[in-house]
């Protein structure tokens, strides 16, 4: 550890002299440059600017226009963008964003867990202090398969690579856009008001400031039947970016963001789908009718089980063109804080049993420092080498759990009363990496890259009941790598084949006190991919891939309900031998002058190892993994038609089809959701110069109640968590630019 600390100090000292810059060249190249020809969609999947058709990685790209058309306002909405990507929005479970790619992800309530799908914003890894809200975004790239060589620890399944709009020194501009809906109006099952704004101010001929912000106010999707009030779920955020082209060779980029949010009565949390006959009668008495799509709960206490969130972060980025090399330095810091009042987890005052949590809070602080040196893109041997350091500290306050049971004679007993524990988790790592591409011929390229990671994960735990302490350490020392071939069949068709060994750090699981913490081993996938990319219709990109991956020590969470106390108990564990294999095809870009489209289909056979016994003691070996649909289809498209001089009409569609989804490591049918379509769309008009637009939109037209989470034996019944994706929304969209 001493060597690691000395190396960290050396990196920090060197940063004083580092010459580097914006979020790479993408920050200084106007957005129009990436859109002047659809065949030249520019991505940064290999930490340099490249055409998407030249990158030997399966990628789904969503432009700003598509994100706004599909109303992608937060990470959870990214479900609709790529068939390979799933985002689970269950509260406190969406580690590092909660994403899974090709069936592989990390769903965990443990504060010591890290993600399998990394979230990277303007080159900065978000760790577990990730952003939630998406606004003023230029594009999003979904990179599939292990990306650890260039992106680091939390990318064993893939990366969500987000690029926001850069400041523009050439002009003053601004924009305001809104999405407005009201519960009960035009069939909308909840209300939501989204307001986003941006202003771009040139400071000089070589620098500019861009400030953007948003407010996302939602009423529902849950309703307190006792008071008749819909839950308020509100979020606010602002981002500032300052870009300065100091010289022709040196660029400085300073970024900062702040966000704040609150939820009432648990926000989007469990409601009852079914229960025993006796309990159903009790639930009916306070206004709850258990069933699919139930939005009601009943709490008499004001604002019980509510939470608040606040987070901020910033980065300083320098880029210097030193002739044969481009040198980059990125220094970043993030901080997130959440607090929860605690309350009745069942959210049903009428039940004889109550599972109650106490007030608690969590703080996450993340510091990262990265240095890179990159060769010119037109060299025979292109390469990127660098070093990366991260230090993430999580402090989780004790959370009391109590179970109370009201007996028929009126006496209340408390079979469980745990005061919880204070958990302090430090995750520190240092890595060196490099990846190169050798142009063996004009058509053939050879890829080779590797990353060495050394780190230390530690947990200090103090039992709130008796003050006893425990300490756990997990040291890591691993190499991940990537190799492959890439061949240009002709000017518009490229093929590739790669092999990658990924790596995701271990966990120190923190079960409910007085149970002691334990180590969950690092996750190591061995993955193979072959694919082709083609340019069609003069500009659209076709991306086809075949993939296979076997994961050693897949990190999973197994949740069961204690039949005596009815307490939900979740344990983190390793499952060795999980496999995912299949095929995917994506088509995105502009099909014609009037039609743009992003569509894709994936077949993913992601399975438990043979003989694996699930939480219900049944053999589910070879069955589909939890949270992973075997088939998924996505379609987003817009057709534009001139109506009058200066005015165009548009019609957009947004459709998803998923096969049956399993939500727990069991064979219970009640913990799955059927195959289903989710259909949405938009119709409206916009000015020919796109300065103004107005439209009507609908999401989940047929009101299909796909849950975020299903849990059997919840309060002697079945519980579901529903989010905004689970109900119909109808509203008005307005947009103005100046």
Locate the predicted segments by residue.
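Membrane-embedded beta-barrel scaffold of Gram-negative outer-membrane proteins
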Residues: 196, 315-344, 488, 492-502, ...
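Surface-exposed extracellular loop regions of Gram-negative outer-membrane beta-barrel proteins
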Residues: 262-273, 393-395, 456, 486-529, ...
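N-terminal Sec signal peptide and the immediately downstream disordered periplasmic leader
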Residues: 1-70, 76-80, 200, 248-249, ...
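Gram-negative outer-membrane beta-barrel transporters
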Residues: 383-384, 442, 446, 548-550, ...
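Outer-membrane beta-barrel translocator/receptor signature
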Residues: 114-116, 135-138, 144-224, 229-238, ...
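Structural signature of Gram-negative outer-membrane beta-barrels, strongest in the C-terminal barrel
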Residues: 243-247, 373-376, 388-390, 423-551, ...
């Amino acid at each position: 550890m001493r060597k690691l600390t000395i190396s960290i100090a050396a990196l920090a000292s060197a940063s004083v002299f580092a010459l580097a810059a914006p979020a790479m060249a993408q920050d200084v190249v106007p957005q129009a440059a990436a859109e002047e020809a659809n065949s030249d969609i520019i991505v940064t999947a290999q930490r340099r600017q490249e055409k998407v058709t030249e990158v030997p990685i399966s990628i789904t790209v969503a432009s700003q226009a598509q994100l706004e058309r599909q109303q992608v306002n937060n990470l959870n909405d990214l479900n609709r963008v790529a068939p390979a990507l799933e985002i689970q929005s269950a509260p406190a479970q969406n580690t590092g964003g909660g994403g899974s790619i090709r069936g592989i992800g990390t769903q965990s309530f443990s504060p010591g867990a890290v993600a399998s799908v990394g979230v990277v914003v303007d080159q900065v890894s978000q760790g577990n202090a990730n952003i939630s809200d998406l606004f003023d975004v230029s594009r999003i790239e979904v990179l599939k398969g292990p990306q650890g060589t260039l992106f680091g620890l939390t990318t064993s399944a893939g990366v969500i690579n987000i690029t926001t709009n850069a400041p523009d020194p050439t002009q003053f501009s601004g924009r305001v856009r809104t999405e407005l809906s009201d519960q009960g109006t035009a069939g909308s099952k909840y209300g939501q008001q989204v307001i986003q704004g941006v202003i771009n101010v040139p400071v000089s001929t070589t620098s500019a400031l861009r400030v953007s912000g948003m407010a996302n106010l939602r009423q529902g999707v849950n309703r307190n039947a006792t008071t008749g009030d819909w839950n308020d779920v509100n979020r606010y955020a602002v981002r500032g970016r300052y870009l300065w082209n100091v010289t022709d060779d040196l660029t400085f980029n300073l970024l900062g963001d702040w966000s704040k949010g609150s939820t009432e009565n648990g926000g989007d949390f469990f409601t009852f789908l079914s229960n025993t006959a006796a309990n159903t009668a009790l639930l009916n008495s306070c206004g709850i009718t258990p069933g699919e799509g139930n939005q009601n709960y009943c709490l008499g206490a004001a604002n019980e089980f509510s939470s608040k969130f606040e987070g901020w972060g910033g980065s300083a980025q320098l880029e210097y063109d030193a002739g044969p090399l481009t040198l980059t330095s990125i220094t970043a810091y993030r901080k997130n804080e959440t607090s929860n009042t605690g309350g009745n987890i069942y959210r049903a005052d009428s039940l004889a049993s109550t599972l109650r949590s106490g007030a608690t809070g969590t703080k996450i602080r993340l510091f990262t420092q990265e240095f890179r040196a990159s060769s010119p893109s037109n060299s025979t041997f292109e390469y990127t080498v660098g070093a990366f350091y991260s230090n993430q500290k999580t402090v989780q306050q004790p959370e009391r759990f109590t179970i109370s049971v009201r007996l028929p004679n009126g006496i209340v007993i408390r079979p469980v009363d745990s005061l919880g524990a204070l958990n302090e988790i430090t995750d520190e790592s240092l890595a060196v990496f490099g990846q190169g591409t050798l142009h063996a011929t004009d058509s053939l390229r050879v890829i080779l890259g590797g990353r060495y990671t050394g780190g230390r994960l530690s947990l200090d735990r103090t039992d709130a009941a008796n003050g006893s302490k425990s300490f756990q350490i997990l040291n890591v020392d691993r190499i991940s790598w990537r190799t492959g071939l890439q061949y240009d069949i002709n000017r518009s068709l490229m093929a590739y084949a790669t092999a990658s060994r990924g790596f995701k750090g271990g966990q120190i699981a923190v079960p409910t006190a007085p149970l002691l913490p334990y180590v969950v081993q690092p996750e190591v996938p061995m993955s193979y991919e072959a694919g082709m990319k083609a340019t069609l219709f003069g500009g659209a990109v076709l991306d086809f891939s075949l993939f296979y991956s076997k994961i050693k020590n897949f990190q999973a969470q197994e949740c069961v309900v204690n039949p005596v106390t009815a307490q939900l108990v979740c344990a983190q564990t390793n499952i060795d031998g999980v496999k995912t294999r299949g095929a995917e095809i994506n088509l995105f870009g502009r099909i014609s002058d009037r039609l743009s489209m992003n569509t894709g289909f994936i077949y993913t056979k992601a399975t438990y190892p043979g003989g694996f016994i699930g939480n219900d003691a049944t053999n589910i070996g070879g069955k589909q993994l939890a949270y992973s649909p075997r088939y998924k289809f996505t379609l987003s498209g817009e057709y534009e038609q001139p109506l009058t001089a200066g005015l165009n009409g548009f019609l957009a569609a947004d459709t998803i089809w998923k096969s049956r989804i399993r939500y727990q490591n069991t064979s219970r049918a009640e913990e799955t959701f059927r195959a289903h379509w989710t259909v949405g769309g938009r119709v409206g008009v916009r000015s020919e110069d796109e300065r103004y637009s107005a439209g009507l939109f609908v999401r989940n037209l047929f009101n299909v109640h796909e849950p975020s989470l299903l849990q059997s034996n919840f309060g002697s019944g079945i519980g579901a968590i529903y989010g905004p994706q689970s109900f119909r929304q109808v509203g008005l969209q307005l947009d103005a630019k100046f």
